């Protein structure tokens, strides 16, 4: 596919949009949606960082759906776990919907939609319901496979990957 959106929703949420085979935009966890463990800084966290009570990285690693409540996946009840995955699905859908608006400006009216990350298969149905479109979960090793394919392209002399130039120092 030349037009697609991938949202990696797990410990944090990162979404990338590709139009005509080129990266059109990306949303990273520190500025938008929290994942299960990490997330954007709220006003209280920003104040604590400004007061030098914690670093921005510490605030980010405590800003997730579960960590804000002092929970872990292993240490929460089934009800808490379901609520966390529901929230994760909502945040992933929100980022995908936002990226879809950007891709429309790049003539990608109906990009394919994918979810990555360990919870992908668990939340894909809910994200599909929220968006009114099919969102396909990727297998857990697909990100590693994608990295290997990019490395192979660079090794073979690719000058760009998805529209981003390859540093001349690493080209063959």
Residue ranges with predicted function:
Residues 55-109:
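Adenine-nucleotide phosphate-binding core of ATP-dependent small-molecule kinases
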